[in-house]
């Protein structure tokens, strides 16, 4: 009944991944991002991650697997996803939704830390403001974006962009794979 739809969805996902893999710059960007994060951890820094909707879940997933574990038992790494509902509702109410992430970065971000901003469109105003706040704090910035990078294009030290212009779920599928690879590489870098 739905076999053709299932095949089409899986084929489109495979095609999106194949297109992402064609660009060697993506491979290099992932490696550079992992080394940047591991270097921050080794120097006493942390990563703060943020995003909206599914990207918010990805930001939490990234932090959870760094503080918890991925594939190997090892010490936890310093990672925070901006996901505190009290903070988000307070800042959203008092300052506006565009400031929910930047206000947190202002409060806990430090020079030597890294911000991971995730936005499938690259147009999330609250993530863009978090990038600005991170810059003011002397933090490094990594972005996971999609399409043409949107308003966030060119705003990061390292941008990992999925050049897919269809539905956001295809971009998210690559984002979660990139997140898992980042964690795997960080684990390798941390034992060097």
Curated annotation (Swiss-Prot):
Binds 1 zinc ion per subunit. Keywords: Carbohydrate metabolism, Cytoplasm, Isomerase, Metal-binding, Zinc. It holds the Pfam family SIS_2. Its cofactor is Zn(2+). The keyword Cell wall biogenesis/degradation does not apply. Zn(2+) binds at residues 61, 65, 172, 180. Its EC number is 5.3.1.28. It is found in: Cytoplasm. The reaction produces a racemic mixture of D-glycero-alpha-D-manno-heptose 7-phosphate and D-glycero-beta-D-manno-heptose 7-phosphate. Belongs to the SIS family. GmhA subfamily. This is Phosphoheptose isomerase.
């Amino acid at each position: 009944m739905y076999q053709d739809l299932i095949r089409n969805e899986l084929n489109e996902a495979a095609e999106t991944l194949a297109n992402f893999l064609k660009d060697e710059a993506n491979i290099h960007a992932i490696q550079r991002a992992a080394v940047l994060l591991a270097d921050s951890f080794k120097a006493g820094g942390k990563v703060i991650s943020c995003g909206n909707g599914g990207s918010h879940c990805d930001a939490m997933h990234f932090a959870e697997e760094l503080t918890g574990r991925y594939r190997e038992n090892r010490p936890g790494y310093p990672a925070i996803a901006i996901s505190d509902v009290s903070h988000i509702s307070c800042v959203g109410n008092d300052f506006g939704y565009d400031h929910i992430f930047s206000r947190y970065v202002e409060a806990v971000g430090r020079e030597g830390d890294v911000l991971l901003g995730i936005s499938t469109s690259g147009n999330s105003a609250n993530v863009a403001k978090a990038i600005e706040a991170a810059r003011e704090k002397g933090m490094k910035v990594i972005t996971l974006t999609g399409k043409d990078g949107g308003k966030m294009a060119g705003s990061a030290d390292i941008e990992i962009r999925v050049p897919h212009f269809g539905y956001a779920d295809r971009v998210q599928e690559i984002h979660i794979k990139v997140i898992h690879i980042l964690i795997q590489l960080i684990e390798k870098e941390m034992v060097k």
